[in-house]
Amino acid sequence: MSKIKLGAYNTLTVLKVALREGNGDPFGLYLDGGPAGEILMPQRYVPEGTEIGDEVEVFVYLDQDERPIATTEEPLAQVGDFAYLECSWVNEYGAFLSWGVMKDLFCPFREQKKRMVIGNSYIVYIHLDEESYRLVASAKVEHYLNEQPRGYKHGQEVDLLIWQKTDLGFKVIVDNQHPGLIYEDQVFQYVHTGDRLKGYISTVRRDGKIDCTLQPTGQQHAEDFAETLLQYLKDNDGVCDLGDKSEAEDIKRRFQVSKKVYKRAVGDLYKRHLITVEPLSIRLVK
């Protein structure tokens, strides 16, 4: 059997029932951890009907005594992930973050940008500390980002994690590995640190950072929005009080799209002879 992966999911074979000394009561199952030896899965995490010889998918991490332990709980993230986690308590060594399993995740002071506060949440990177062989979190996420993206194309869909607000817009983490940015004028919805959203590649810059948008790029997006706008007109007596001369902020507030996309959609509906266009409104053709 290959070496188990700490802080990650593993598929392990059930070896035997774990029995308490003295009364012989079962308190879980022992799983085959290969070179790591037998790994306990406590009784409360054992799926009903599990038998000796079965293979089970479990998350393996370290218990209070730094021994590998298996659980069927679903963590909020695993080793190699960036995540937005809440600080649950602190001591003289660092902070401890809730991440969906019984034992909280340790973030030492040296890995904090500023002292973490109980109840606040932070973007962190989860990794296995090579010196202590402990699962730890680091709030210095820029040290773990890959600034040499490869193969991205304009308009490609990606996964985004909102990292932090800046004067330019929002820093994001792209596909759990690269730094990116959504400019303020490209944000047409409420977003918050820790949000996970679908996004689209706008530009890959020379410095390796990626400019993203939250809307599909190009003509297809305008065509899709044209159908949304058409339905809006049908639902509102055939009138929309936004036209070519309307403010971009008013369009953004109403439809969560840019003025450019709105004008393309209006042009599409006009070419199809479905609307008439006025400076401050559009109307369905009756």
PLM features: residue spans?
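Single-stranded RNA-binding regions, centering on S1/OB-family and related RNA-binding modules
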Residues: 1-286
